Amino acid sequence: MEAERINLIGTTLEDLTERTQELRRYLDYDAKFERLRTVNASLEDPAVWNDPKKAQELGKEKKSLDAVVLTLQKLTTELADNAELYEMSKEEGDEAGLTTIEAEAEKLRPLIEELEFRRMFSNEADPLNCFVDIQAGAGGTEACDWASMLLRQYLKYAERKGFKATVEEETPGDVAGIKSATIKIEGEYAYGLLRTETGVHRLVRKSPFDSSGGRHTSFASLFVYPEIDDSIEININPSDVRTDTYRASGAGGQHINKTDSAVRLTHIPTGIVVQCQDGRSQHSNRDVAWQRLRSRLYDFEMRKRMEEQQKLEDTKTDVGWGHQIRSYVLDNSRIKDLRTNVEVSATQKVLDGDLDVFIEASLKQGV
């Protein structure tokens, strides 16, 4: 094996070791290790199952801690072992040994990159589940169809990530597609990954609804906000909330809703509107709507504290050119993020939920 390649293996091991040590400091390995010991001890106590909710929270925390602690332990041990073997193989001229070390180093690299990616989640709500609101904008039937394509795209994205996705509200379009929908996505760092998807998404294509085959431009907006739990206190003055009930829309049939079971809540001071119609009763829809309102208000206050607050309802009331984040030009096989300038040509792959290249670029650039 040539000297240049041998030296490169050594340099690679040094680089990976330095990055691992930096991650141990940044991710506060020692504190997480001690916390993991405490959590494991609690889960081993049979009494913990007397409170299933608490046990579930501990199980979730253990999974998150394991991902950091066990990975850092593996990296530290294996990099040290490989560094020792490298010196021995280098002295003995053991090419097979050096080749093995080279391969092992490349196996460890993605583990480091995954932990480094976690460093970009600085928002306190990043680890939480999230809601994704989709709303058709300018473009009529074409926009409603585009909104339904985005609904499918984010359901596919959740599937790729191993997240649980539930369509909690869906309002069909007059001709095709949807006017609006809300997805609940449950998984580790669901909000952190998807929060930069908030904004207007533009579609340019030859419309299947236009017999002349003309190109149409349409818009749909996304609004992503975290699901907050009961441990976060959000005080809402009931007099600030207007409640409207209406008949849930649907395809009909024997289960068609003949009562005003759908609920819409409007928080008057902020203009935030949430709605729910999927439950069979007004009571269940009201409970879900209030949960979403609490989540929306938490997100609103958090953004204001971080001096990042924007007019949150702009993405719903002005779904057009001015708020675009991504452009999908299907005829030219081009999807471009207008904030990061990341551009891809594999349009169907993206529409099938492969959004990682856009999301990672947004997080890395601090969008």
UniProtKB/Swiss-Prot annotation:
Sites of N5-methylglutamine modification: 254
A UniProt-annotated Pfam family: PCRF
Recorded superkingdom: Bacteria
A cellular component term, taken from the record's GO annotations: cytoplasm
Post-translational modification: Methylated by PrmC. Methylation increases the termination efficiency of RF2.
InterPro entries named in the record: PCRF (IPR005139), Pep_chain_release_fac_I (IPR000352), Pep_chain_release_fac_I_sf (IPR045853), PrfB (IPR004374)
Any one Gene Ontology molecular-function term assigned to this protein's record: translation release factor activity, codon specific
Localisation per UniProt entry: Cytoplasm
SUPFAM superfamilies, per database record: Release factor (SSF75620)
Keyword Zinc: no
UniProt keywords, alphabetically: Cytoplasm, Methylation, Protein biosynthesis
Family label: Belongs to the prokaryotic/mitochondrial release factor family.
Function: Peptide chain release factor 2 directs the termination of translation in response to the peptide chain termination codons UGA and UAA.
Annotated protein name in UniProt: Peptide chain release factor 2
